[in-house]
From Swiss-Prot:
One of its GO terms (molecular function) is structural constituent of ribosome. SUPFAM superfamilies: Ribosomal protein L29 (L29p). Coiled coil: none annotated. Belongs to the universal ribosomal protein uL29 family. This is Large ribosomal subunit protein uL29.
C-alpha cells in the first residue's frame, strides 16, 4: 500500500489496517517457522507496510 493512499484514510481505518497487517505478519511468521512459507519476501513487504501505516499515524497525530 502506498503512503499517499494511507494519508487519505482516517484514524479508525488506519488502526484497522494496522491490525490486519499485524495478523498477516503473525501468520507469515508461523508459516516460516513450520517451513510452509515459500515466498519469504512477503515478510519484508508486510513489515514495511506496517512501518508505513505507523508513520502515517504518527504524522497525523503530530498535526493536531
Amino acid at each position: 500500500m502506498k503512503a499517499s493512499e494511507l494519508l487519505q484514510k482516517d484514524q479508525a481505518a488506519l488502526n484497522k489496517e494496522l491490525a490486519d497487517l499485524l495478523k498477516a505478519q503473525f501468520g507469515l511468521r508461523m508459516q516460516l517457522a513450520t517451513q510452509q512459507l515459500t515466498n519469504t519476501s512477503q515478510l519484508k513487504k508486510v513489515r514495511r507496510d506496517i512501518a508505513r501505516v505507523r508513520t502515517v499515524m504518527t504524522q497525523k497525530a503530530n498535526q493536531k
